[in-house]
Amino acid sequence: LQGGGHEVSNIDYKGGDFQADLSTQEGVDAAVQAVWDRYPDGIDGLISNAGVGPTATPEKIFALNFYAGIELAEGLRPLLKKKRGCCVMTSSNSITNFTVRMDWVELLTNLRNKQRGLELARMLPQQQSASCYSSSKHALARWVRRVSPAWAVDGLRINAVAPGNTATPMTR
């Protein structure tokens, strides 16, 4: 995109154009506000790619892999609408494996209460983190499917992609 003359900005924990800890509500709120401040006339697209793997705590996995992406997308949706932009959410090919807990997927997508979801995550043992990872990514993909018709009414496209293992700082 940059090679084509487009401006690309990123939100990252360290070293991004906008620095924010997206695993916290304060970080998500600050990131959304920073994008609004910089691009009040709208944005062409959003790629929500933040996440942590199964070595993180269950709470951090749910906070970053599920809630942060949704809150960014919803918080920036009006900016996307101004330019009829699109949103891509990064899910994972792990959503098809045996570690997905459909009860957790249902809880995340139906409850939509971040505080209660994170309370559940705090009660889970670290040994459940692989299931937390795949379940959070499955829930994110399900959320995208649920909201895509409403986004389409506004002329917006939203989709989830499920790449395989990709060389990122998380996988190195």
Where are these regions (language model features)?
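A glycine-rich helix->loop->beta "capping" turn
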Residues: 34-48, 54-55, 80, 84-85, ...
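A hydrophobic alpha-helix adjacent to the NAD(P)-binding/active-site core of NAD(P)-dependent oxidoreductases
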Residues: 17, 61-62
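Hydrophobic positions on the long internal alpha-helix
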Residues: 31, 47, 72-80, 143-144
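Canonical Rossmann dinucleotide-binding motif of NAD(H)/NADP(H)-dependent dehydrogenases/reductases
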Residues: 1-9
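Catalytic loop of short-chain dehydrogenase/reductase
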Residues: 52-59, 81-154, 165-168
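Rossmann-fold cofactor-recognition segment
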Residues: 11-28, 36
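Hydrophobic structural elements of the Rossmann-like NAD(P)H-binding subdomain
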Residues: 47, 88-90, 158-161, 171
